[in-house]
């Protein structure tokens, strides 16, 4: 098991008050590492697939980042990344299910990172 996954699970189970965590379902852009999400934000100019391809090419890993339909539990913000036109929160997520033709199916929990666009207002 990856050390980051162990830390995320420990954080979710020991550092916060006892509560049920709500899972979210839907399409999400996920990457294996926070650094990959930061790079995704740098090359993102409105086309998610092009940015994903760029990161995957740089990483020499066709699966480093992907857009997928999942069920996940979101963790706390671990950083903010900016491009010239967008700003994103970077958050860890633990994927607990994937969407199949029969609906969402549970999977072994796996840690990934995702960007969440910040709505910025001109002042």
Question: Where are each of the predicted segments found?
Answer:
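Positively charged n-region of N-terminal signal peptides that target proteins for export
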Residues: 1-4
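Bacterial N-terminal signal peptides
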Residues: 6-15
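Serine/threonine-rich, low-complexity intrinsically disordered segments
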Residues: 15-16, 116
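SH3-family beta-barrel domains
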Residues: 19-58, 67, 122
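Boundary regions of SH3-family modules and the immediately adjacent low-complexity/disordered segments
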Residues: 22-28, 94-123
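Residue "hotspots" at secondary-structure boundaries inside conserved domains
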Residues: 63-65
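SH3/SH3-like beta-barrel superfamily modules
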Residues: 68-109
């Amino acid at each position: 098991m990856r050390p980051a996954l162990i830390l995320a699970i420990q954080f979710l189970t020991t550092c916060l008050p006892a509560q049920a965590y709500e899972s979210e379902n839907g399409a999400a852009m996920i990457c294996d590492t926070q650094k990959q999400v930061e790079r995704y934000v740098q090359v993102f100019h409105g086309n998610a697939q092009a940015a994903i391809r760029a990161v995957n090419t740089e990483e020499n890993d066709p699966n480093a980042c992907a857009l997928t339909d999942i069920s996940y539990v979101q963790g706390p913000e671990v950083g903010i990344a900016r491009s010239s036109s967008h700003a994103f929160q970077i958050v860890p997520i633990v994927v607990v299910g994937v969407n199949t033709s029969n609906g969402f199916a549970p999977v072994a929990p796996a840690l990934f990172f995702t960007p969440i666009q910040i709505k910025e207002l001109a002042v």
